[in-house]
Amino acid sequence: MINFNQAAENNKKPILTELKRILVEPGALLEIGSGSGQHVLYMAELLQDVIWQPTEMAVNLSALAHNLTSSRIHNILQPFELEVGKDWPNGEYRYAYAANVLHIMSEKLLPSIFKELKEVVQAGGIAVFYGPFKYNGYFTTDSNKRFDEWLRKKSSEAGIRDIEMVLAEAHNSGFTLIEDIAMPANNQLLVFSRQ
């Protein structure tokens, strides 16, 4: 597998446990930033009523497509290029899912991701974000603080986001937080409903 990611391997089971409970209706799901495809390959097989649309930035798209080629899982569509802050292809999805995306992309793009989701997630649909967050300006653990420092050394645009800022941008685009679930390794699963 090209671009294998150990963190994705470690978190796929606990995330799936929650998604089985959240994604109860059949429908299409837009995965933002599919990375190596480890999540879609694992989860689509076990959530057969959900049609998965993997996406990735242009620079990573060929690796994702390569990893998905050998898959015979019927509910995974061909991946396409998607970048927050640029035009998204038309589509209508019941669900959207992004794991470890918000702390990698620029904070300036937070308004864009929710505005773009509003255009593609149907009313009453669900958007799910997995990753670490700060609460009231504070890291939840020392390890998250160290992780944030490491991220910012790699890119000045990256960093763990304040939950309050995420919630405000979500609200501005018609998304309401319905669950904030504590996950292993100091991460959260944020579940939003689109009005």
Where are these regions (language model features)?
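Class I SAM-dependent methyltransferase Rossmann-like catalytic core
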Residues: 1-25
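A short acidic, Gly/Pro-enriched loop at the edge of an enzyme's catalytic core
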Residues: 88-96
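Conserved beta-strand signature within the Rossmann-like core of class I S-adenosyl-L-methionine
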Residues: 124-133
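A short, conserved alpha-helix within the catalytic core of class I
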Residues: 105-117
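Conserved glycine-rich SAM-binding loop
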Residues: 35
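Class I SAM-dependent methyltransferase SAM/SAH-binding core
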Residues: 30, 38-86
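Core SAM-dependent methyltransferase catalytic element
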Residues: 175-195
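Short alpha-helix
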Residues: 157-174
